[in-house]
């Protein structure tokens, strides 16, 4: 007899145009699985994935690249993606790295590479953009700049964004709606309400709740794509 555990169950969520919804939870809680079901990469055992999103784009948590292989940004953008040069330059410009068009992929910093990945995903102007841990390998200032970029994309493209992140401080200042998963939805709502929820506190601790309740990144400056500050 084969017994299969369900990775996630009872998941119900809604992502509207121009809205950022963030999935949080411990490792193995079903965040990436949920995202892949929404993208129809994985099939559901029960229930339906419905919506009006005609075009969906995905930036996975990990991407396998042979960093020793000569590969320019413009060529990387075209791999398994039928993009014309106008789409490529426009999307790279939107993510602030259009000057890197002919640079080698292996020469990019962590933040620059993430911006190229996001540019590749938004080149065809998706209705829904799914970002799985989009700031991996990026320093603190770069993280701030990337989360600001994600917010700009949601506004400028009026697309829904499903974000998976462990960076709680940035989640609290960037997202519109938080869903806390641990195999099922433990709690959901606005960031300020979720951090006070008993289920959230049970998972992440009272100190975390008090620290994050309610963090926002206030400033009178902007961040460049490398994380540096411009007045």
Residue ranges and their predicted role:
Residues 125:
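Conserved catalytic motifs of ABC-family nucleotide-binding domains
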Residues 104-108, 112:
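Conserved ABC ATPase signature
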Residues 178-190:
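H-loop (His-switch) and adjacent beta-strand-loop-beta switch element
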Residues 129-133:
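Catalytic Walker B motif of ABC-type/P-loop ATPase nucleotide-binding domains
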Residues 85-100:
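Conserved ABC ATPase "signature" region
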Residues 165-166:
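H-loop/switch region of ABC-family ATPase nucleotide-binding domains
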Residues 203-231:
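ABC ATPase nucleotide-binding domains
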């Amino acid at each position: 007899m084969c017994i299969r555990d369900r990775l996630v169950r009872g998941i119900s969520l809604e992502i509207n145009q121009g809205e950022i919804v963030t999935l949080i939870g411990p490792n193995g809680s079903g965040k990436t699985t949920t995202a892949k079901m929404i993208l129809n990469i994985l099939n559901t055992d029960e229930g339906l994935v419905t919506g009006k999103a005609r075009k969906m784009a995905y930036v996975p948590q990990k991407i396998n690249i042979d960093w020793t292989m000569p590969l320019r940004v413009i060529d990387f953008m075209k791999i398994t993606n039928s993009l014309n040069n106008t789409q490529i330059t426009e999307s790279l410009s939107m993510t602030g790295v259009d000057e890197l068009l002919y640079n080698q992929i292996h020469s990019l910093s962590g933040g620059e590479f993430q911006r190229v990945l996001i540019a590749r995903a938004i080149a065809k102007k998706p209705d829904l953009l799914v970002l799985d841990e989009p700031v991996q390998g990026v320093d603190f200032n770069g993280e701030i700049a990337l989360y600001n970029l994600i917010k700009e994309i949601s506004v400028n493209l009026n697309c829904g964004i499903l974000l998976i992140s462990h960076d709680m401080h940035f989640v609290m200042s960037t997202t519109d709606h938080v869903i806390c998963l641990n195999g099922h939805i433990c709690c959901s709502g606005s960031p300020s309400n979720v951090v006070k929820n008993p289920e959230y506190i049970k998972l992440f601790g009272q100190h975390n709740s008090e620290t994050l309740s309610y963090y926002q990144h206030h400033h009178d400056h902007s961040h460049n794509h490398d994380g540096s500050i411009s007045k």
